[in-house]
Amino acid sequence: MENLTVNAVVDNLDEVTGFVLKRLDNYGCSKKTLMQIRLAVEEIFVTIASYAFDPSVGPAEVRCEVMQDPLRVVIQFLDGGRPFDPLAKEDADTSADALFSRDGGLGILLVKETMDGVSYSYENGKNILTIEKKLKDTEEACL
């Protein structure tokens, strides 16, 4: 698995998304699949940058690997910030009135609904959030 370590600050978002998307260059992914992966990466990294170490700054590691059978990308986000399982919270309410509330949770709901797998663990003092997206097994994924 290739990895990138950066300070968990929003200013590093472009570097993180570029790192992930570059690994998909040779797989002919559809625009839809790339956008779903990009949005998931952005949501997760911005959440880490905003809350993991607040008010200080710490490192975040992003690991990315394209796997075979089925063809898919596995992306892991690791940080040593305070323990936080974004999957433990009940899914956000998507009714019209709730969309204007500040309860949060819409971002992780988007990740859960667009990725094929999402898991969280806390090991050796690190939050580890793993997302997985199939690259060829769906009609619109990759050509």
Residue ranges and their predicted role:
Residues 43-47, 113:
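Conserved polar catalytic motif of the HATPase_c/GHKL fold
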Residues 1-4, 8-10, 112-143:
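Flexible, glycine-/charge-rich segments associated with ATP-binding catalytic modules
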Residues 20-42, 100-102:
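Conserved short strand/loop->alpha-helix "switch" segment adjacent to the catalytic nucleotide/phosphoryl-transfer site
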Residues 58-66:
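A conserved short beta-strand within the histidine kinase catalytic ATPase domain
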Residues 2-31:
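Helix-loop-beta hinge of the Bergerat
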Residues 71-103:
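Glycine-rich/acidic phosphate-handling loop/turn and adjacent ATP-lid/helix
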Residues 99-115:
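Glycine-rich phosphate-binding loop
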Residues 52-57:
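A short, flexible helix-to-loop-to-beta junction within the catalytic ATP-binding CA
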